[in-house]
Curated annotation (Swiss-Prot):
It is found in: Membrane. PANTHER family: POPEYE DOMAIN CONTAINING PROTEIN, POPEYE DOMAIN-CONTAINING PROTEIN 3. Glycans are attached at residue 4. It comes from Mus musculus. Expressed in cardiac and skeletal muscle. InterPro entries: cNMP-bd_dom_sf, POPDC1-3, POPDC1-3_dom. Pfam families: POPDC1-3 (PF04831). This is Popeye domain-containing protein 3. It is a multi-pass membrane protein. The chain crosses the membrane at residues 27-44, 48-70, 77-99. GO terms for biological process: regulation of membrane potential. GO terms for molecular function: cAMP binding.
Amino acid sequence: MEKNSSLWKSLVTEHPLCTTWKQEAEGAIYHLASILFVVGFMGGSGFFGLLYVFSLLGLGFLSSAVWAWVDICAADIFSWNFVLFVICFMQFVHIAYQVHSITFARDFHVLYSSLFKPLGIPLPVFRTIALSSEVVSLEKEHCYAMQGKTSIDRLSVLISGRIRVTVDGEFLHYISPFQFLDSPEWDSLRPTEEGIFQVTLTADTDCRYVSWRRKKLYLLFAQHRYISRLFSVLIGSDIADKLYALNDRVYIGKKHHYDIRLPNYYHMSTPDLSRSPLTEQFRNSRQHCNK
């Protein structure tokens, strides 16, 4: 205790005060290092934010080391700043390698470029999403889901091809690439609930889609709240697009357009809808769906 008090006394009370200050300013290297420190500590989060921080802090420590070696000739100041520069450099190389080593199959690259990259989703986050999914092929006239039979146990995004959506043999709308196949079904259930499809989804052409199992995706949401909010936004937007696409297809009577968002649509539309030519085509394709 006495040693600690004597050390504190020698550092604070017995340390000579600065009676005279240097009139001349430090060299440009010192001020450059200070500027790099200020700008470096303004870095953001995420992998690219860390690259920004460690690159500028490393340059700041390197400038301080040069200043200590050239201007004030202080070996201890030079040593500490150089060690800190090496640490920042190693961190920068490690993070850059992590970012560069992220590779995906072609389908995932297309999905990221078209759906996730425009939203500013970093590659490491997308890698976490992709690791929980699988790429599946669906041949023409085969079914992804059948009305009243297929359970809702996954969530999928179409990568290529086109899916035809029907209910009781009546055509509703198409699903195009980079749209969810089953966003309305997913949104209609709570995590603890189970359900079956109320529509039939048939491949109009050869298709490929990325699919997540329901339980695995909910586990991912529980671990990463950011990913949960991201999917909530994507699914909500996709459902809105499907509603507008379906609204454009609905006609009541002779060329009278009816808005499906009106509350009494369900009771008015079903009896008056005439069967479309696609009904027979859908029935002919049922043999593929039952396999």
